[in-house]
Amino acid sequence: MLMPGYSLIDKLHLKLTLWRRSRFILAGRRIMRRIGFKYVRMIEFVRPLDAPIPIIETKLKVEVRPFLTEDSENKIYDRICFTPGDNLPLHDKTLRRVASGNEECLVAIVNGEVAGYIWLLFIGTNYEPAIEIEETFAEGEGLVYQLNVFANYRKKYIAKKLINNGLSYFKSKGYRKCYSYVESDNMPSIKSFEGMGFHPSRVITCLRIFKFKRKKEANSQR
């Protein structure tokens, strides 16, 4: 008769212990956020290019085309920032990236407006600021990254269309596989990449310091 009662008490004690631990973990995370620390989890996705690429039908008529040097004078790109720190409307940083020959920016156009874009890295090294690491890609390995679809055009399969065009480009050039990096809380992007045949290969965790960085940057500007 004692054993069932003991088991019940034991289970309640275990639940209470786990609850206390979870409270400590949550409290610890809140304190870390308040002082400027944050855990960033990035998922690395990979996709072999010998697998068929799904055909995507968007809900709107979309034209996907590369951003070219002469496009810097095109009015539809005036207020669009393809690269952080771009000097609009000159797009100086974007043009340098395109001119390097290592990268290309694919732009989705809907009714004469930019709906979104995605970057392709053909060869070389990519720096991920969110997790503060550099990844070098071998010959035959490409990177599809910095996917961005503007709010008015989301849920129209435009993200998948951009990924589709990126994969098709890499496959036409004889690449073997394609990578991408997505933050673990960015569910729309995760679903888009998984829907295009990507699968997670690893999770990278980084402890970032945000408030200290901002203060440091502010002091450096004085």
Features from the language model and the residues they span:
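Conserved catalytic-core motifs of GNAT/GCN5-like acyltransferases
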Residues: 44-45, 199-213
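Residue-level detector of high-confidence beta-strand sites
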Residues: 117, 160, 201-203
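Conserved hydrophobic beta-strand within the GNAT/NAT acetyltransferase core sheet
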Residues: 178-182
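Residue-level recognition of the GNAT/N-acetyltransferase active site
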Residues: 150, 183
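Conserved active-site alpha-helix within GNAT-family acetyltransferase domains
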Residues: 184-202
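Acyl-donor-binding surface of acyltransferase catalytic domains
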Residues: 1-94
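Conserved acyl-donor/pantetheine-binding loop and adjacent beta-alpha core of acyl/acetyltransferases
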Residues: 85, 101, 109, 113-142
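Conserved acetyl-CoA-binding loop-helix of GNAT-fold acetyltransferases
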Residues: 146-149, 155-172, 177, 191-195
